[in-house]
């Protein structure tokens, strides 16, 4: 599962790493959805134009804009920092960023989606998630689904970019069956499900 698929660049990487897997992708920003559908052309992926949240229905999504320049000069409006959470002090880290007006998006929960979509006794090797501070919200509404997941790779930026964003401890608390395996550059954390994955050998 790729939650927060954005333009599909990481989708293609996941497809290369797991050549026999089907990648289920979630994205709610219309600009990113358009990019994804241009970049990703494969029957091994499915894109769901919805935001995973703690309820099913409709919610405000806070899009990002602006242009960072440099290697992103030709990208256009920056759509990689939008969130269900309101912006806080993101401009402290990215002064060029613009906070765009909120838009309405459709939402569902991880558990509701899985119950409708995945077969019984499924196994999910990996959840890759980057939803700009709202990761714990997704996990708290996916308790049953997480029982079938081996690993979670999640972003957890400690900088106050969004109001109500999860801290590292709060993210860990939302994954009670998981333990932290490794922290990677870019504020990325890898967790493993200790009920499904054997302990590492030392």
Regions of interest found by a model, annotated:
Residues 1-202:
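Phosphate/nucleotide-binding beta-alpha loop and adjacent structural elements of enzyme active sites
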């Amino acid at each position: 599962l790729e939650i927060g698929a954005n333009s599909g660049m990481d989708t293609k990487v996941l497809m290369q790493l797991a050549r026999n897997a089907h990648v289920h992708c979630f994205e709610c920003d219309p600009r990113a959805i358009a990019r994804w559908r241009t970049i990703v052309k494969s029957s091994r992926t499915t894109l769901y134009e919805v935001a995973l949240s703690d309820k099913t229905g409709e919610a405000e999504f806070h899009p990002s804009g602006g242009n960072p320049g440099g290697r992103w000069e030709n990208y256009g409006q920056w759509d990689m920092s939008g969130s269900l959470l309101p912006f806080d002090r993101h401009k402290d880290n990215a002064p060029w960023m613009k906070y765009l007006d909120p838009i309405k998006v459709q939402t569902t929960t991880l558990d509701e989606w899985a119950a409708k979509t995945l077969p019984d006794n499924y196994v999910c090797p990996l959840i890759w998630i980057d939803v700009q501070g709202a990761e714990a919200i997704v996990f708290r509404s996916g308790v049953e689904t997480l029982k079938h997941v081996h690993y979670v790779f999640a972003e957890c930026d400690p900088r106050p970019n969004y109001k109500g964003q999860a801290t590292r401890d709060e993210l860990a608390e939302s994954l009670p069956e998981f333990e932290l395996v490794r922290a990677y550059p870019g504020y990325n954390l890898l967790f493993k499900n200790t009920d499904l994955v054997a302990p590492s050998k030392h």
